[in-house]
Amino acid sequence: MSRPLDGIRILDFTHVLAGPFATRILGDMGADVVKINSIDRATGVNLATHPYFLQFNRNKRSLALDMAQEASRALSRKLCDEADIVINNFSVGVLKRWGIDFDTVAETNAGVIYAEMSGMGDTGPWSKFVTYA
């Protein structure tokens, strides 16, 4: 039986709760979700053996990269070229520093759907505050 999102490729740059939960639902609906784990952000709940990680990252493939390295950022940009959807919930400016912001991704993937969910939005007086959801 086919599922509604069969054939849709999602590149998942999310962590904590809101992002992984959203992409889990998309994976449950058939999307091919590739979760990018930054090895320099490893915490207990981000370990592949932790029940929290298993709960919110089911139905996903996973790739661990050191985003402090240019080679990892370049690979991420290449994966963005092949994605239908790129989703992240990092703080404002993080993906721009990595060269994975909407404007950069759209230069080589004009049809990409780019979803961001920073805790306080991209602009405004609260935009620089880090939140966890």
Residue ranges and their predicted role:
Residues 1-133:
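N-terminal helix-loop segment corresponding to the beta1-alpha1 unit
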